[in-house]
Amino acid sequence: MESRKDMVVFLDGGQLGTLVGKRVSNLSEAVGSPLPEPPEKMVPRGCLSPRAVPPATRERGGGGPEEEPVDGLAGSAAGPGAEPQVAGAAMLGPGPPAPSVDSLSGQGQPSSSDTESDFYEEIEVSCTPDCATGNAEYQHSKGSGSEALVGSPNGGSETPKSNGGSGGGGSQGTLACSASDQMRRYRTAFTREQIARLEKEFYRENYVSRPRRCELAAALNLPETTIKVWFQNRRMKDKRQRLAMTWPHPADPAFYTYMMSHAAAAGGLPYPFPSHLPLPYYSPVGLGAASAASAAASPFSGSLRPLDTFRVLSQPYPRPELLCAFRHPPLYPGPAHGLGASAGGPCSCLACHSGPANGLAPRAAAASDFTCASTSRSDSFLTFAPSVLSKASSVALDQREEVPLTR
């Protein structure tokens, strides 16, 4: 009590530096502990952070008894606010606080850099919720590890454990991210047998029922959903091909009827349009005339009656056979003029050889208008592939007819 009263009296008198040094030295000699640390290190535990300790103190490492005594530091210009704090900390008690402060200062110095590195460690950032959760857990574990490091005297030994646990959480979050990124649906690789069976079924009926889908799924070892999607895509493909075929034809009713007559002659082909069969295009020669004039000049104007046209259009999905224009020798002469037919081979199109066997009325006059001879051909239209038209755009019409069909 006496010493505390004297300290208060001398604090009021202003003779602070020398008395603080004497009292502290007397207390340290009485207790038997080494000299206390400078006032910069005697900071409360709650304030211990990487930025609370000055850089000069960090460079010196853990302080020992060889450092400067408190007398010189207390006499320096530390300010009147820090001196009462030092005196009060020295007068608290001579027992256990001194070893705890020493152990904290001895092990807190190297651990301050660890804490700083923990605070500023980079963390992976991702947009998926799983990764965000993993990063949140990672940060939480990091924060708890740093708190344990500051609060406990043996925080340095607990640092690897906390780092290991947090690293495990981060790796789990990264694995979850990669697993979510790899969950993609790839295209089904159909075999030739599966494609042939599906095409055969589509040729039979365009819309397949669910029991039939189940049978196909069991027979082909495919999921029912895959078969359903395949039929949807196949119907859309067939629709696009039919629209591409019939797009330019309504401008010329006679030519449209002629083309649809070939579509009505479909029968044995598994695919509605073979890949080697190009789409028909108008010739630039016949585009200048009006549709009525071209219909009147066309030899196919009386080839089919309106009833036959409606009969052709009544079929839901026509499968056209090989076009007559690609079988005629005048357009593509030679044995390799296109689709394997010889130069003098017969033509089996409806416009040339449709008779009572095909369900059409006999028409001798119309048949005489158009035969397979090279003398009867029409200049009002020609069917060419786009590649042929692009290559022979500046060639005369007679030379253009001799261009072989490109597969």
Swiss-Prot record:
Keyword RNA-binding applies: no
Gene name linked to the record: EVX1
GO biological process, one term: interneuron migration
GO cellular component, one term: nucleoplasm
Protein's name in the database: Homeobox even-skipped homolog protein 1
Organism: Homo sapiens
Keywords of this entry: Developmental protein, DNA-binding, Homeobox, Nucleus
Annotated signal peptide: none
Location(s), subcellular: Nucleus
Listed Polar residues bias regions: 102-114
